[in-house]
Amino acid sequence: FKVRVSGRSTKAMYERGLAHVTSDTVCFPAKLVHGHIRNLVDAGVDRIFMPIITTVPTENTASTSEWMCAVVKGYPYVMRNSDNPEERFGVPFDTPLFHWYDEGDRNRQLKAWCKETFDIDADLVAKATEQADRAQETFENQLQLRGRQVLENVREDGGYAVVIASRPYHNDPLVNHGLPKLFSERGIPVLTPDAVPGVCNVDLSNSRIDICLLYTSPSP
């Protein structure tokens, strides 16, 4: 397979998809999805993959939520009915449903879906998954190393860095409205939560986890 991701978010991309937004009250990132689907169609892709992932293992050592945001996990359903890439553009739109409570669930479900959809052998899927896991681990290690270096530098200089506590899609410059740039232009380093060493080992036993979503802060 040759992987093609949609282009960088722009205001024009966002506006292009607005006509198919089914609810004006849905969040901005969800509205932006419609424009990204159009972008992939324009790029000439022959298939679009937008899985429905309901659960993923928590990254914190404490027992916290495993559920994904209702919009994140439900929006592939919305896109299938509002934009319908298969009917409108002739582009197959894959929206498999996954429940990844642990790594074993993920591996079994990926093997089953790839076999059913593309007739790909389970051993080949396992090898690809292992390579992806190694690549992700390498990335996370490099990110943590760089975060540690930044924190050490600001301590030595008597300054400080800013951690923008957010969800992964807030890394999109259009979604975060350029907030990281606002700090960095003033010489203040900006880190994402996963760049902070030890962030997944924070003791949450004294917190009340009153939410059902990942990436949302607990109440003190």
List the model feature ranges, each with a label.
Residues 1-4, 45-49, 90-92, 160-161, ...:
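Beta-sheet entry/capping signal
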Residues 23-30, 65-69, 99-100, 169-173, ...:
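Hydrophobic alpha-helical scaffolding
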Residues 98-197:
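A charged, amphipathic alpha-helical module
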Residues 21, 30-93:
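N-terminal glycine-rich phosphate/adenylate-binding segment common to multiple enzyme folds
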Residues 15-20, 58-67, 105-110, 174-177, ...:
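Short acidic, glycine/serine/threonine-rich loops at helix termini
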Residues 215-219:
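Conserved small/polar residues in nucleotide/adenosyl-binding loops
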Residues 5-28, 37, 42, 106-109, ...:
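Non-catalytic structural scaffold of enzyme domains
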Residues 2-25, 96-103, 188-211:
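Short connector loops at secondary-structure junctions
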